[in-house]
A protein has these predicted regions:
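Expand to "…catalyze enediolate/carbanion chemistry for C-C bond making/breaking, isomerization
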Residues: 1-173
């Protein structure tokens, strides 16, 4: 049976280890240059950069070749954008401008399969031949919330109550 690839970033964070993730590679060739350097993952920029549904599959495959976990910052907190990004090969998503508890809950709902969320039942290339894929994918997906607005700070206590968020990232906004 095929195993789900390890999310190196999530694994290391769960073990209290430091992770190294460069931001900005724009094509698979550049990602391959990062591969031998030992990074845990690559941050693919889809909000302020050219990463989109057309190139996520190739960029994430380049990460796979070197055992790096691809994280994609998407351009909006919209369920279809989030789950499609995972379906195309991302192991994590970073969601900009999450300001309320309900917005954080929407991220989880779009990122996780039932019973934790409402992500559509599609296995993508990562799930082919993987026993219990949906359960394993729920454990492996990395969800990152970006706090870029003062309203998020004002709502921080409520947002932190939301389960299944892995990283709370304070970003300049």
């Amino acid at each position: 049976m095929v195993e789900l690839r390890d999310n190196k970033i999530k694994h290391n964070l769960n073990n209290g280890e430091i992770v190294a993730i460069p931001m900005g590679p724009l094509n698979g060739d550049i990602i391959e240059h990062f591969g031998p350097l030992g990074f845990d993952g690559i941050w693919l920029e889809g909000e302020h950069g050219p990463v989109d549904f057309n190139n996520i599959p190739d960029l994430t495959r380049a990460c796979d070749l070197w055992g790096m976990s691809p994280i994609v910052r998407v351009h909006q907190n919209e369920p279809g954008v989030i789950y499609r990004t995972f379906d195309l090969g991302a192991q994590g998503v970073a969601i900009p401008h999450v300001n309320t508890k309900s917005e954080a809950e929407a991220v989880v709902s779009a990122s996780k399969f039932a019973p934790l969320g409402m992500r559509g039942s599609f296995t993508s290339r990562q799930g082919i031949g993987v026993d219990n894929y949906f359960s394993k994918a729920n454990d492996a997906t990395l969800t990152i919330l970006l706090f870029e607005d003062i309203v998020a700070v004002n709502n921080l206590d409520e947002i932190l109550e939301v389960d299944h968020i892995d990283v709370f990232y304070v970003a300049p906004g």
